[in-house]
């Protein structure tokens, strides 16, 4: 049976220059061939588990035993975890096998609108991220994009990103199929 690692190796052999993997980290992490593993960590133990179920300890154990240091935490900031940004930054800095942390704001899909942040809350989170950058935390986002993310004043969709999810190919991501969602996009990479 083929593994995710087999697919990463095959993509490299096909000529893809960069092969990144996005994961929730609940399975052992053995992907040294991946350029970057974007691993969802949505806060400290309490907040992460409130967002993603009781997975925090499993994820941290899997990171400890990962076969490479190509992991980047990937946090979607929302109403539940907005006060844990500093914690995730410091955890990224202090955890073996973690190279950096990357952020997004929650994109308010119809069934999760209550999790979205106000403009003021986004600005506050960006100030915390900037402080962490100044402390030397390896943040994988561009500070110059923060004003656009706070105001939602960047062009969407991102035509450079193509996502295959459950057999459906989308420009930018699955949010493109939800009416009026692109204008509320929280993906930092789109503005960057």
Give the location of each predicted region.
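Conserved Radical SAM active-site core
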Residues: 1-20, 26-35
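Radical SAM enzyme [4Fe-4S]-AdoMet core and its adjacent flexible, acidic
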Residues: 5-6, 14, 33-36, 40-166, ...
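Membrane-interface junctions of multi-pass transporters
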Residues: 168, 172-192
């Amino acid at each position: 049976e083929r593994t995710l690692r087999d697919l990463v190796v095959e993509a490299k052999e096909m000529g893809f220059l960069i092969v990144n993997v996005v994961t929730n980290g609940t399975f052992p992490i053995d992907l040294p061939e991946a350029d970057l593993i974007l691993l969802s960590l949505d806060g400290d133990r309490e907040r992460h588990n409130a967002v993603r179920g009781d997975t925090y300890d499993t994820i941290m154990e899997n990171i400890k035993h990962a076969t490479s240091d190509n992991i980047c935490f990937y946090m979607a900031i929302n109403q539940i975890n907005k006060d844990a940004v500093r914690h995730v930054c410091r955890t990224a800095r202090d955890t073996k096998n973690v190279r950096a942390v990357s952020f997004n704001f929650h994109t308010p899909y119809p069934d999760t609108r209550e999790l979205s942040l106000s403009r003021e809350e986004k600005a506050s989170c960006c100030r915390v991220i900037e402080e962490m950058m100044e402390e030397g935390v390896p943040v994988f986002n561009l500070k110059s994009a923060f004003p656009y993310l706070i105001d939602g004043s960047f062009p969407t969709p991102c035509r450079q990103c193509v996502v295959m999810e459950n057999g459906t190919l989308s420009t930018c991501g699955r949010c493109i199929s939800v009416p009026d969602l692109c204008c509320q996009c929280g993906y930092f990479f789109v503005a960057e």
